[in-house]
Amino acid sequence: MRYLTAGESHGPSLTAIIEGIPAGLKLSAKDINEDLKRRQGGYGRGNRMKIETDQVIISSGVRHGKTLGSPITLTVTNKDHSKWLDIMSVEDIEERLKQKRRIKHPRPGHADLVGGIKYRFDDLRNALERSSARETTMRVAIGAIAKRILKEIGIEIANHIVVFGGKEITVPDKLTVQQIKVLSSQSQVAIVNPSFEQEIKDYIDSVKKAGDTIGGVIETIVGGVPVGLGSYVHWDRKLDAKIAQAVVSINAFKGVEFGLGFKSGFLKGSQVMDSISWTKDQGYIRQSNNLGGFEGGMTNGEPIVVRGVMKPIPTLYKPLMSVDIDTHEPYRATVERSDPTALPAAGVVMEAVVATVLVTEVLEKFSSDNMYELKEAVKLYRNYVNHF
């Protein structure tokens, strides 16, 4: 499976082309729109979420509610584009109109300045538009398709916020993936402990009032993963490495860990490694999951537990100092529309990219032209593992 996305934040639309989805997968626009709606939710989101109400158009690769095995084309219209017709015009326009929304005061923490230098832009909007988190709309759409495949082969995925701007959320022990999914979806701030709900909302309100932003830590958990996805044979086939790359590719993500993650560096080996046992009913199991479901770059049958660290959103309503790229004089950074936090939405994106990587790996191991063959291959493999 592979894909490309295209489109600018305030352009006419966003597009994705996905190749490698097996034929026979039940799929409708509704399946994708549900996740697009989740991405636009969460406490603290701004006015653009009220403008867009994203709806996907499937223009190829699906017929009568089932995939055809051919490339799937997805499009999401940017409803806000009607207000940007001159600024985002494909054709050349008058110089005075170009200057109307030109960006020359780069925002610290964004791609503005470095993108302008790299591509020789005198209007930093050219970098801003594509580097915007608006692009993640299509990655969520792609992830929605990936999750449909995972569900068909008994793999489920969920996410929740574990740290909100320095405030750590106490997570109840031994929650299942399904329980996490339900609890997180019932929370406006995507947490699984309702006793923290109002505290986090009040905190977001105070941050917004101060013109500031906050980041945090998001945890994604995947259950029902077969043993042996990924490989130890080559560095670039390690599945945890592929997931790490995908997570850090999300806008504003600055770190990733699995299981105990960085805490492992403060512990002894006897405190970290997961003891192995065997039962007739379950086969090989671990007595703990400190390694987050991975050994040697391969899944070991335990749930995948991966956390991503999201920095605070760089666009500040009380902007930091920057420089005018024309005069090189000190200047306040440009202010674009922004939110105090986007953690709940980022959790949906993280869930999507993890699902996409997993499906790509599944389709590589169990190469199948159609969903029937895929499900049979996975079933046969699971049976083999249970009797190893």
From Swiss-Prot:
Names of required cofactors: FMNH2
One cellular component term from this protein's GO annotations in UniProt: cytosol
Binding site for NADP(+): 39, 45
Any GO BP annotation: amino acid biosynthetic process
Pathway: Metabolic intermediate biosynthesis; chorismate biosynthesis; chorismate from D-erythrose 4-phosphate and phosphoenolpyruvate: step 7/7
Enzyme class at the top of the EC tree: lyase
PROSITE patterns: CHORISMATE_SYNTHASE_1 (PS00787), CHORISMATE_SYNTHASE_2 (PS00788), CHORISMATE_SYNTHASE_3 (PS00789)
Keywords: Amino-acid biosynthesis, Aromatic amino acid biosynthesis, FAD, Flavoprotein, FMN, Lyase, NADP
Binding site for FMN: 130-132, 251-252, 296, 311-315, 337
Cofactor binding note of this UniProt entry: Reduced FMN (FMNH(2)).
GO molecular function annotations of the record: chorismate synthase activity; FMN binding
Reactions performed catalytically: 5-O-(1-carboxyvinyl)-3-phosphoshikimate = chorismate + phosphate
EC number: 4.2.3.5
Keyword Lyase found: yes
Pfam families per record: Chorismate_synt (PF01264)
Function of the molecule: This reaction introduces a second double bond into the aromatic ring system.
Complexes and interactors: Homotetramer.
Family: Belongs to the chorismate synthase family.
Name the UniProt record assigns to this protein: Chorismate synthase
Organism: Streptococcus agalactiae serotype Ia (strain ATCC 27591 / A909 / CDC SS700)
Gene: aroC
